[in-house]
Amino acid sequence: MPEAPELDIFQKEVQEMKADQKSLEQRVSTLERTSDRHDQQIISINEKLNKIEENTTWIKRSITGAIITAVSTGIIGGAIAVFYNLLQK
């Protein structure tokens, strides 16, 4: 007869372990979903950063082009003024 209470104890422990396992499976499932969402967010952020980088590249090119144009205009305008003064004399 003493075996019956031990079986009840083992059965309760097995049931508790099964309940713990189900709980852990649910937690793992939740973590996997969260991880998937984070992966999607990271991909989205990387795409946005690439677009920003492309726009920044064009802005840099535009500013560089404007500076080169301004310097060239100044040099050419100055050269024309110098030659005009030399021709006037």
Curated annotation (Swiss-Prot):
InterPro entries: Haemolysin_XhlA (IPR019715). SUPFAM superfamilies: Tropomyosin (SSF57997). Pfam families: XhlA. To B.licheniformis xpaF1 and to B.subtilis XhlA. This is Uncharacterized 10.1 kDa protein in ORF3 5'region.
